[in-house]
Regions:
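Phosphate-backbone recognition surface of nucleic-acid-processing proteins
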Residues: 1-3, 7, 12-88, 92
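Low-complexity, acidic/Ser/Thr- and charged residue-rich accessory regions of DNA metabolism proteins
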Residues: 44-45, 81-131
């Protein structure tokens, strides 16, 4: 996990959330981090999907900084990020939260011995890149 996130972030995630191996599926790891989505609605008002923020704020903070760096490290993620920002009307925060969620799921799989490959996270063909 430290190879993807860095040593400091890896230590913070491990100390606040425990090992990703302790969680039965990636969704439960997302939930522990407070990154699961919930609709904010009231009465007849149908709200948008927002993260719940019920998990560790420290883990989310460090995870956020990793997600900010990710588009600069990988061209596939950078292309996806630019497309997402363009599609959502310049909402960069929404794109970063989407990257945070993808990263959390990735960390769960990496903890189980899978090799990190950004082509597994994003549809490379729809991004106009070679597979």
């Amino acid at each position: 996990v430290a190879r993807v996130t860095g040593k400091a972030t890896s230590l913070v995630l491990e100390s606040t959330l425990g090992s990703p191996l302790d969680y039965p599926n990636p969704g439960s790891y997302l939930k522990a981090m407070g990154l699961n989505l919930k609709e904010r609605s009231s009465g007849k008002h149908k709200g948008q999907l927002k993260i719940t923020k019920r998990g560790s704020s420290l883990a989310r903070k460090y995870h956020y900084f990793v997600a900010l760096r990710w588009p600069y490290k990988d061209p596939i993620i950078a292309r996806w990020y630019r497309n997402k920002v363009r599609r959502d009307g310049q909402l960069k925060g929404k794109a970063i939260v989407a990257i945070m969620r993808k990263l959390a799921r990735t960390l769960w799989h990496i903890a189980r011995g899978e090799v990190f490959d950004s082509r597994k996270l994003f549809d490379v063909r729809s991004l106009g890149m070679n597979a």
